[in-house]
Amino acid sequence: MASSAVSLQSISMTTLNNLSCNQQFHRSSLLGSSKSFQNLGISSNGSDFSYPSSFTAKKNLTASRALSQNGNIENPRPSKVQELSVYEINELDRHSPKILKNAFSLMFGLGDLVPFTNKLYTGDLKKRVGITAGLCVVIEHVPEKKGERFEATYSFYFGDYGHLSVQGPYLTYEDSFLAITGGAGIFEGAYGQVKLQQLVYPTKLFYTFYLKGLANDLPLELTGTPVPPSKDIEPAPEAKALEPSGVISNYTN
């Protein structure tokens, strides 16, 4: 029995010593980890966990670089507003528009489609610049206003200068505003809105673009003083006859 007691005491002491050694090892590990956290600038106090100041500084520096260069704040989308006026005229020689009926009625109804293309002239009516091309979807026939509400998606083509695209409501009974959704050529990056004025439905319309986002000023030949909109407007004879003095370079036809 005495030898058994000695053995049990020996085992117990060995186990306690091992536990003590393990506890000291874990304490040393924790202290080492804590020092490592401190060296990194990271707090190990649970909810007080934080990034090192050097990391925060680098993050702020990166953000600053993204926003500025040479000390100047950059605006990736120029906000200067440039006005551009054009006339859209249907001269009844382009087999446009086409009416694709989906509604079961003689009048326009929801879902009817109207693809179209018309001629485009500068606001001063001195030059032919190109065409419009797009699609109108009938949203509603408005009998009390003797007109229609369309949802329109179309583009304005300006020969070598590029094109502008728009989307929004086209109301045949009152003025409306559409969103400028983009452009190409000199109109790359364009955004803003365009005012549509119905002069003679569906053959004469006047547009005033309020353009933002352009890298450069608009060409002078596109920005002549516009003729006041009226139902009696007509393009200059040179523009209508497509004479060299009456068109822009490589006008879109």
Swiss-Prot record:
Gene Ontology BP annotations: jasmonic acid biosynthetic process; response to cold
Protein name per the record: Allene oxide cyclase 2, chloroplastic
Single Gene Ontology MF annotation: allene-oxide cyclase activity
Name of the gene this protein is made from: AOC2
Broad class of enzyme this protein falls into: isomerase
Tissue specificity: Highly expressed in fully developed leaves.
Keyword Lyase: no
Organism: Arabidopsis thaliana
Transit peptide residues according to the UniProt entry: 1-77
Induction (free text): High local and systemic induction by wounding.
Organism taxonomic ancestry: Eukaryota, Viridiplantae, Streptophyta, Embryophyta, Tracheophyta
InterPro entries: Allene_ox_cyc, Allene_oxi_cyc_Dirigent, Allene_oxi_cyc_sf
Catalytic activity: (9Z,13S,15Z)-12,13-epoxyoctadeca-9,11,15-trienoate = (9S,13S,15Z)-12-oxophyto-10,15-dienoate
